[in-house]
């Protein structure tokens, strides 16, 4: 038991300088992109089993590194994502006077989270429009898939699954790799 506690303390101590840099990514005085990239690469392959800090908190993406990029970039998109303990999630994106809110369910297995997007809510200048069913093969998505068609070979329309592989999470910052291979830093959204 004591050995496990010492190992945990050693891991946390080793990660703390990198986590400190990642915490600053969402501040008014962020680190340089090179410093943030180095910290992200140092922390991305760590092992963590407690994902409780992710739940019931709104997160906003602030920094991202593509798989083959030498350096990451700070994100300017106004977006927030929340994972609730009941297995539901929302992902909100703001663009000028528009707000898109994707809602659905997720399954967390180990460090992998699979998202199933079910509804899209749109607000124009704060006025809500009717919710749209965007489940695969249902509603408007079925129409788009039938018009768009599929790949040769009769497999139908195929898309990359919505999967995050979580790398790190504490009360103020989390790191996840998406199905595209890009890795992002998310910070707790204020308010």
Q: Model-flagged regions — what are they?
A:
Residues 1-16:
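N-terminal chloroplast transit peptides
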Residues 16-191:
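Soluble ligand-binding/transfer domains with enclosed cavities or grooves
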């Amino acid at each position: 038991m004591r050995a496990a506690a010492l190992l945990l303390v050693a891991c946390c101590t080793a990660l703390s300088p990198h986590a400190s840099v990642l915490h600053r990514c969402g501040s008014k005085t962020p680190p340089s992109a090179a410093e943030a990239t180095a910290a992200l690469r140092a922390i991305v392959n760590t092992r963590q089993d407690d994902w409780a800090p992710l739940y019931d908190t709104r997160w906003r993406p602030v920094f991202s590194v593509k798989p083959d990029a030498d350096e990451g970039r700070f994100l300017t998109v106004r977006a927030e994502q929340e994972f609730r303990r009941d297995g539901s999630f929302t992902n909100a994106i703001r663009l000028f006077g528009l707000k898109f809110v994707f809602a659905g369910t997720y399954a967390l297995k180990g460090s992998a989270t699979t998202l199933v997007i079910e509804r899209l809510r749109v607000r124009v200048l704060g006025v809500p429009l009717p919710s749209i069913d965007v489940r695969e093969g249902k509603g408007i998505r079925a129409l788009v898939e039938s018009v768009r068609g599929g790949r040769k070979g009769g497999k139908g329309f195929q898309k990359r699954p919505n999967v995050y592989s979580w790398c790190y999470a504490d009360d103020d910052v989390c790191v996840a790799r998406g199905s595209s291979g890009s890795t992002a830093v998310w910070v707790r959204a204020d308010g």
